[in-house]
Amino acid sequence: MKKVLSLIFLSLFTLFLVACGGKKEEATKNEGETKKEARVIKVTTKFVDDEQTAKSLVKVVEAINKRSNGSLELQLFTSGTLPIGKDGMEQVANGSDWILVDGVNFLGDYVPDYNAVTGPMLYQSFEEYLRMVKTPLVQDLNAQALEKGIKVLSLDWLFGFRNIEAKKAIKTPEDMKGLKLRVPTSQLYTFTIEAMGGNPVAMPYPDTYAALQQGVIDGLEGSILSFYGTKQYENVKEYSLTRHLLGVSAVCISKKCWDSLTDEERTIIQEEFDKGAEDNLTETEKLEDEYAQKLKDNGVTFHEVDAEAFNKAVAPVYDKFPKWTPGIYDKIMENLTQIREDIKNGK
C-alpha cells in the first residue's frame, strides 16, 4: 500500500513540475514578446522649441508613441539638429525611417508642380490654401510624390504668411534693391525675392541669427510666429507685410518605412498628424495677434506695402520653371476661382 501511495505521490509531483515549467516557459515567451524593440522613426524639423509648430509636433509624437503601445518610438529633433530641407527630404526619398516636417518647396525638387501650388501672391487666406490641397489637382501631386518614394502625410501645417524682416522698411520693390535677404535653398524662394527686387542668400534657417549679427545678410523673410519665436527681432526691427508666400510645412515619411508598418500603425500616425495640423492652425491663428503685439513691445515697426506693385513684380516668376506642367498656373487659378466662389457662397 505504501508503495502504491509513493508512486501516486511521485506522479503528482512530476505533473506539478511539468505544469510549473510550462508556465515559466509561457511567461518567458510573453516577456520576450513584451520586450520587442520599438520601431524608431526620426522626426526632423527646422522649427525651434519655442515655435508653435515644434510645440504641436511634441504633442503628435507623444500621442503616437502612447497609442502604439510600444511598437513605435518617434524621436523628435527640432532646430535642424538632424538633416532638414533638401538633405532631410533625401533621407525620406531614400527609404530611411524618417519623417520630415519642412517647406512644401522641398517636395518641389521631386514633383516640381508643388512649387506652383505654393507660388507667390496666390492666396488671400489660410482657408483658400487648405481647400486647394484637397483638390484632385494636388492629390495627383501626392500620388506622383509616392512614386518618388515620398508618402505625403499632410500639407496642412500652416505657420502664417511670409513677410520681410529687415534693417529698413519696405514699401515698394524699389526699396528691396541691394538688400541681402536669407531664403531657404529653393528656386521658388530665390526667384521670388529676386523678382521683388532683393538679393537672395540661401542658407539654413538656424544660421540666420548669427548671419544677421555679423552683417552677412540684411534681413530675411518669414512669418510673424517665426520672427518672434526665433528672436530675430533682436537684430532687425522693421517688418514689412508683403505676404509674398504662405508659410506652410509638408509632413513626409519614407514610402519604404510607411509600407513596412502595420495598418494600425499607419492609422495612428495619419490620425495624429492630422490632429496636430488642426492644433497647430488653431494656435497659430490665436498667436499671430499676440506675437504682433509682443514684437511691437520689443521695438518692431510694422509696415503695409504697395501690394499691387509687388503682385506685378512677381508675375514673371511663374514663367521661370520649365519643369512645371504646361498650363499648371491656369489650372491652379481655375481651382482657386471656384474655391473663392464657394467660400463667398458659404459652401
Please annotate each region the language model reported.
Residues M1-V4:
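Positively charged n-region of N-terminal signal peptides that target proteins for export
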Residues L7-F13:
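Sec-dependent N-terminal signal peptides
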Residues F16-A19:
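C-terminal motif of bacterial Sec signal peptides marking the signal peptidase cleavage site
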Residues G21-E127, L137, A145-K347:
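N-terminal secretory/targeting leader peptides
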Residues R131:
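Short beta-strand-centered segments that line the small-molecule binding cleft or hinge
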Residues N142:
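Thiol/selenol-based redox catalytic cores and closely related redox-interacting motifs
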